[in-house]
Amino acid sequence: MVDMKIWIDDVRPAPEGYVWCTTVNQAKSVIEDEDAIYVSGIELIDIDHDAGSYAEFGGDYIKLLDWLEETGRNYPIRIHSMNPVGVENMRRIIQKNGWTEIR
């Protein structure tokens, strides 16, 4: 069994070794199913802010952080967004919850 890394982005393809999610709803499903598949846990969530045309399927990616907070989940997070305001908003959620941000 291995730890899973999740890449959440609508445009940039996932690096090798990552599960690529393009929507918030897809990422939620992957996270909820992690116990049922081949992984022992989630090593990292590498996340963009802007979901582009995929926003209709769960909102911009910051909504995933809101959901993680609501459900009490805690995983290391890396933000790879080019949106400086979005990055700061995501960092506030990460810091408020005491989550680990990988830079």
Language model regions located:
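Catalytic phosphate/metal-binding cores of nucleic-acid and nucleotide-processing enzymes, i.e., regions
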Residues: M1-R103
